[in-house]
A protein has these predicted regions:
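Short, low-complexity N-terminal intrinsically disordered segments enriched in polar/charged residues
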Residues: 1-32
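Residues at structural and domain junctions
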Residues: 11-12, 35, 58, 94
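Alpha-helical elements of Rossmann-like donor-binding domains used by nucleotide-donor carbohydrate transfer enzymes
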Residues: 13, 48-51, 103
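Short, charged/polar micro-motifs that form catalytic or ligand-binding hotspots
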Residues: 16, 39, 94
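A solvent-exposed, acidic/Ser-Thr-rich amphipathic alpha-helical stretch
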Residues: 23-87
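A beta-strand edge to alpha-helix "cap/lid" segment located at domain peripheries
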Residues: 58-147
Length: 147
């Protein structure tokens, strides 16, 4: 049970660090040789993952990532996990909004520093985009800009 909770906490930290643009925190979730598969982009190292995410998720982009209903299987020092993703993206400067769902498929490895991701990636179940009405007020918190 402790390993299950440690893996859940790792994924929760990944989502929190992603939305607060804490790139060092995101990097700490991965082993150096980690890989990632995002829609329309693949990464072959932890450095490549952080480069991609920090470039795609500019400070003015507001995001919310929630991971639900983890299905985690542990085999000694390795584990796999499937997570249900619900995400929202707001880009007020472009009057753009996205909401979607998907399934994450992760692989984890136990290291001397605890559990880390060796692969993450998701496939969409749906994605809905819309325009933000100019009368809608969106106030971005400092934490969402990485401050």
């Amino acid at each position: 049970m402790l390993d299950l909770e440690a893996i859940r906490q790792l994924k929760y930290a990944y989502f929190r660090c992603l939305d607060t643009k804490d790139w060092e925190g995101v990097a700490a979730c991965f082993v150096p040789e980690a890989t990632a598969t995002y829609p329309h982009h693949e990464c072959e190292s932890r450095v490549a993952i952080i480069d991609f995410l920090s470039t795609a998720m500019v400070p003015d982009l507001i995001t919310m990532h929630h991971g639900h209903h983890p299905e985690i299987e542990i085999d000694n020092d390795r584990a796999t996990g499937t997570w249900y993703l619900h995400d929202r993206v707001l880009a007020p400067a472009f009057e753009f909004a996205l909401e979607g769902a998907g399934l994450y498929a992760d692989r984890y490895v136990r290291t001397v520093d605890g559990w880390r991701m060796e692969h993450t990636g998701y496939a969409r179940i749906f994605e809905s985009t819309s325009t933000i009405d100019s009368g809608v007020k969106i106030e971005q918190g400092k934490r969402s800009r990485g401050e």
